[in-house]
Amino acid sequence: MSRENVELVKRLYDAWEKDGFGVVPALMDPDIEYVNPQYAVEPGPRRGYEGFAIAAEAVRAVYPTRRFEPLAFYDARDRVAVRVRVVARGVGSSVEVDAERGYVFDVRDGKVVRFAWFNEPDEALKAVGLEE
């Protein structure tokens, strides 16, 4: 099943590339949890499609121009860690942010049930028990 989970997460990135970062009901559980790390401006979880949509809108508001480029997918059974290149420009800024981040997707019954992000890709690997 874990290979299918990686493919599911890849389809989610394809949807985000096409339609923008946000809720994708076909690939996400209605009770999805979006988790900001403790060092985030607004730490903690957001729940459901509405919570995910609010968190995604906050990202779009700060970084109206952004691109997520998955660099590597790590299979961890019912979890998938992703090393991602984020290229973004903040509101009113001419400075481009170009950094690698780590994301973790928890999958159950063919849907993403939890999404968590980390400033450092190694944090995501550690979170799923795969230290690089």
PLM regions with names:
Residues M1-E132:
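C-terminal and inter-domain tail/linker signature
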